[in-house]
Amino acid sequence: MGQKSNPIGLRLKIINTWDSLWYANKDYTTKLHEDFLLRKFIKKAFYHASISKVVIARKVDVIMVNVYSAKPGVIIGKKGADIDKVKQKIVKMINNNIELNIIEVKKPELKAILIAENIAQQLERRVSFRRAMKRSVQSCLKIGAKGIKVSCAGRLGGAEIARTEWYKEGSVPLHTFRANIDYGFSEAKTIYGIIGVKVWVYLGETKSSNE
C-alpha cells in the first residue's frame, strides 16, 4: 500500500495537514474549484519563484493565501509592485477580497516538489538524466535528509522505447506512518515527449499529530 499511495495523502491527520483550511456546505465544489484555479494561477505567474506549496484559508469576507517560496523576492518584486499586480488579478478572477502572504522556505533542497521541478528543468535543458538525479540526491543528503528516492519515466535520453530509471540513497520507509516523507511530482516537456519526475524525501520519524 505504501508503495502505490501518495505519501502525503496517506499521512493526512497522522503527521500531515490539508493545504485547504476551510469548511463549506452547499457551495463546496465552487470553493474547491476556486482553490484549484488560485494554485494554478500562482504557480504559473511565479514559475521561477520555486513555490513549494500554497495554503488557502477562508474567513467570511476574505481569503487568506500563504505562498511558501524559496525565492520570495521574485514574487514580491521591487517595492512590492509585482505582488500588488497579482492581487488585483486574483480579486478580478474570484471576485473576493484576498490576503496574500509570502513565506520563505529555509531549506529548498529538502522539499520534494522543488527537487522534482529542478530535475525537470534540467532535463528540458538537455542535461543527462543520471547527472541531474545524482546531483539533486547528493545535495539533499548533504543538507540533512535521511534518505531520498528519485524516479524518471519516459523517453530518457531520446530512446525509442520509454522506460523508468530510479536512483536511491539512504532509507525511505514508505510503509511507516510516523516517517516524515515529503513527495513531489513534476513533468519535463522535452523534444522527445514528456518525462515524469517523482521524488520521495525521508526527513526522519516524527510524532503523530494526535499524540
UniProtKB/Swiss-Prot annotation:
Domain KH type-2: 38-106
Coiled coil: none
Annotated Pfam families: KH_2, Ribosomal_S3_C
InterPro entries membership: KH_dom, KH_dom-like_a/b, KH_dom_type_2, KH_sf_prok-type, Ribosomal_S3_C_sf, Ribosomal_uS3_bac-typ, Ribosomal_uS3_C, Ribosomal_uS3_CS
Protein origin, superkingdom: Bacteria
GO molecular function terms noted in the UniProt entry: mRNA binding; rRNA binding; structural constituent of ribosome
Entry GO terms, CC: cytosolic small ribosomal subunit
HAMAP family, per the entry: Ribosomal_uS3_B
Family per similarity comment: Belongs to the universal ribosomal protein uS3 family.
Summary of the function given for this chain in its UniProt record: Binds the lower part of the 30S subunit head. Binds mRNA in the 70S ribosome, positioning it for translation.
Subunit structure comment from the entry: Part of the 30S ribosomal subunit. Forms a tight complex with proteins S10 and S14.
Name assigned to this protein: Small ribosomal subunit protein uS3
